[in-house]
Every structure is written in structure tokens, then in C-alpha cells.
Amino acid sequence: MENEIIKERFLGTIFGQAVGDALGLSTEFMSKQEVDRFYPNGIEDYSQIVQDDHRRRWQRGDWTDDTDMMLCILDSFVACQKVDILDIARRFKEWMMNGGMGIGRHTYNVMALGDYTSNPQKAAEIIWKMGKKKAAANGAVIHFKFVLNVCLYHFLKLN
């Protein structure tokens, strides 16, 4: 595959994440019935986003923590030229300490542990065990696709 095509597809995943996340905020935490009531004809523009207690925390068109954290991963990869878990953890923690808009309780609890930046996996395990192994946050799934794209882009660029 030509480098320019790879670059365009890679950038497309970044823009797609941000735009999709900003539009997805319109229905985040809503039931199907609420979505049907507030958006009977779907949603085509940020101006249509209902301003309830959850959504009014963001300006219309803003993305959520999902894109912020994806950008932390991207910044880390650009700086380190590899997937560096400790650098990503440091960037996540810095983002959290500077507002961390939309951060979930489980993610906050993991990052708030004192040794999170030196051992993020252990911090996550501690919080998971403290919650009796019932937490099922899915943020890792959201970010995995981007990490996979970063690795694929890097691999194809080298070959």
C-alpha cells in the first residue's frame, strides 16, 4: 500500500474518532427510548444535541475523554516512536490532573493511586480487586483500535 494512502487512512481514524465521539456524546448514557424521543429523525448536526445535565458540561461539538485519551496515546507514540505504557500512563495522569473532562469513576480511581505512573497495570488490578472484580469498564476496547492502527502504520511505514 502506498505511504500516502496509509497516511490518509491513519488520519481518517483520528478525525473519525473525534467527530464520531463528539456526535456520540449526543446519546451517551441515554436509553433507546430517550434517544427515540430526543432524536426521532436522527442527528446530523452538533446544534441538535440536547443540553441535559450530562451534555451541558461540554460545548456542542466537543469530544469526550475517549478522544482526549486517544490523543494522549498518539502524543506518546510520536514522542517515543513506540508504544510505551509508562509514558502513556504519565500522559493520562497529566490529562486527569488538568481537568480530565468526562473521566469515569473507575478510571479516576486507577489513575489516582500513588504508583499508577510507575505501574499502571498493578494499579488497575488493585482497583479491580477492591471492586470485587465486578468492574467492566470498556475504555480499553475504545483505545485498543487506535493503538492497533498506530502499530500497523508504523509497521507498514518500515516495510
Where are these regions (language model features)?
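Structured, active/binding-site neighborhoods that engage oxygen-rich ligands
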Residues: 1-159
